Every structure is written in structure tokens, then in C-alpha cells.
Amino acid sequence: MNTRHSVLGFCLALSLVAGAQTNSGGISADMLRQIEKAQPASSSDKAIFNAIASNNIDDLSKNFRNQGPIDTYFSVETPKQSIHDQKSSGRCWMFSGLNVLRSNFSRNHGDSITVEFSHDYLFFFDQLEKSNLFLQGVIDNAKKPMEDERVRFFFKSPLNDGGTFCGVADLAEKYGLVPKSVQPETFSAENTRIMSRLITSKLREYGLELRKMVADGKSQKTIQVRKTEMLSTVYRMLSLTLGEPVKEFTYAFKDKNGKAIGTPKTYTPQEFYQETVGGPLNGTFIMAMNDPRRPYYQTYEVEYDRHTYDGHNWKYVNLPVEDISQMAIASLKDGRKLYSSYDVGKQLDRKRGYLDTDNFDYGTLFGTTFPMTKAERISTFDSGSTHAMTLTAVDLDANGKPIKWKVENSWGADNGQKGCMIMTNRWFGEYMFRLVVDKKYVPENILKVEQQKPIMVMPEDPLFGVDNDECQ
């Protein structure tokens, strides 16, 4: 009896302590009264509430002085090309990367020949390779507990449709490319959610099975045989949703007006890659990033931020915006478009296709300020690289300094500026994150930095945890 009373008393004491701890940090009745008392009781606030209650916040926050005609002149501009639409998918990285490759092909032929690459074809192998990356990652970490940070990383997101330019390079080199007309988009390529959900669920199931096989002491050979069987199921699911990858096709290139040039030829995907790209992509470019949290002129690498198990992680040189701008300008002046990525949802006037830090004045509407720096926004998960677009033009002042930039987007030709977006240089500085630059436009001192042994960054880092938020 005494023991029972002691246990009850101990539990009661614990609950009282827990209650006291909660109350000390919670919103008390007195605190709530103070909060309510601090609210302005002006008629203007009542008017603001009535306006916000019936309208979109962005519409009410628009800076009227920024609503004039947008200057569409650019002193440096690469040749225009057709605009694509990624639809309800997170494949912006692929659209931007292939935009660069098809632009390079046209440029190498005096802009007299065009090519449209199949996104569906490359996406098939992207999803198959990411499935293998997950399964092999589970095997490699199978002796760690499920609560381990790396194990949780894999099971949290076994498969996604986001990515980076290193994925385009690795996948295209390994599997080749095919024309869009040979393997066009399917419904699931343009609407990835359900397909991805089903394959993701299957991968998690397989991941648990592989962990059990390791725990039971199965041989590596037996485990690899089973993994191959698992990937066969994934392959079938992808074949039924995206179509089985083309292995050989007949194709004739077309001029700018869509007229066929020459006699049609038969290609394999690898042969078509050699015909259009002409050689390895890896090793020809650097990936620059602006992350003000970390020291500049250092090389970093993001663990497991790759598309294929045997491929390349996202390795980048951290640079000031000014250095990145100068490399971009040099490339654009030579007619070369660039893969780039941004936090596109910030201060975006989507209808006008215009990005400027003064597009919306949320602070005045709510009677507060939003003063965080770029570094602070990254550290607190408030900002990061969310959407890839193709940098295509820059407008320079009399001193050669950038005023504004232009990008080809992948939200369709009816979006923004005929499928493009214009961004002011001040917006570029705040919300630009990644740029892929051919090494011929990179200064020698930065090339030397790129050769450093990279500092490894964990994939849970805030800058990489929000990738692909705004892609769709």
C-alpha cells in the first residue's frame, strides 16, 4: 500500500513539475492580455483587415512604383530558342541542363540547326539510378540503427524528381540522349506525384528487406542478386509510366524553320549524344555557389547529392556574387547560356515574369520588417536553391556592371515574359545560388580553388534541404 502511494505521489510530482515547465514557457492568460493590449486599435487596421480578408496578400503588397513597363532591352543576349514546360514535375534541373546542351549544339552549327532532347528518356534513367542509389545506400548503412541520421536520410526521401546539373552530365554520358520526337512526354513524366509515391513506397519496403538480409548475415552476392530483382520491378513500373527507353531510332536534324536537313540516319542514344554533345561533360565545367555562411574561395562537396551511385556529388566553389557575375557575363558575351538556380519564390511577380527585391512591400502592410540577411535566411531554412533556370542574357551599364538578367524558364511559353523571366541585379545578388560555368570562362585563381580537396557538407544542410520546393 505504501509503495503504491509512493509511486502515485512520484507520478503526481512529475506531472506538476512538467506542468510548471510548460506554463513558464507557454502563453499564460496574463501574457495573452498583454499581447492583445499591444494591438493597435486604429481604424486603419480595421480597413487593412477588411482588405486582406477579401484579397490575395501579394496583390495588396505590390509596390505600385514597380508596376511600370519592364525594360526588356539587354546589351548581351544569346540566341532565343523554344520554351519548354515541365508541367507538374520537379525536373527544372533537367530542362535547364538540356537547354544549355541544345543551345551549345545550335551555336556550334552557326544557329542553323536545332535539336530538342527528350526529357522523358533521361528522366527514366534518373529515376532508376536514384532507386539504385537508395538501395545501395541502405546496404552500405545497414548495420546502423534505424534512428541513425544517415539511415533516416535515405528512408525519408528514397526517390525525388529534383536534381542538379551533375545529374544531367552523369546521366547523359552514361545513357546518351534521344530526340524529343522519338520519346515524347507521358502523363506521368509531366505529373510525377503518383508515380513517385508508389515507387517510393516500394523502395522503403525493399530497404527494410535489405537491412534484414544484412542482419541475417546474407552474402554480398546474394544481396546484390536480390537488389537486381528489386530494380527489375522498379524498371517495370517506370516502363509502364514513362515508356521503355528507346535503344535505336532514325532521325534527321532540322533547321530553325523545322525543315529536315539531309538524309535520316539511324542512331543509338550514345551515338546521338556523341553527335550532339561531342564528348564528356564532366571535367569541362565548374559549379559555383554563393553561400555567405561559409568562407569564400573554398571547394565543398555535398555527400549523397548525386543522381547515380557511381556518379559525381554536387561539388562547388563558394564565391562572392561579383565573381559569379563576371564569369556569367564572359560566357554570355561568347554566346553561351548557363545552368543557374535561384530561390525563385521570393519577390516573384509571376504574371509579369519579373523578379525584384521591391516587388512586394509586406512589411508596410503588416507594420513590421523582414530584415534577415542572405546568410541568416539560409541558416534558418528561410531561403535556398529551389528552382533551376537557364541564364540567357545580361544588361550592362556604361562601366560593364550588370543592371538586370534574363533567364529561360520551364513553365511554358505563356508564362512571364514569353516563357522567360527578367531579374534585377539586386534580386540576383540576394536569391541566386548556383551557376555552372565552362572552364574557359573561369579565371585561373578560381580554377586553382576548384582543384582543392573539397570540404564535405552533409545533405541535411539548410541550403540543400529545400531544393526543388518551388520547381513545380
Model-derived regions, located:
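N-terminal regions that are enriched for targeting/export leaders
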Residues: 23-82
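Bacterial N-terminal signal peptides
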Residues: 9-17
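Boundary at the C-terminal end of the N-terminal hydrophobic targeting segment
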Residues: 18-22
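Bacterial N-terminal signal peptides that target proteins for export
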Residues: 1-8
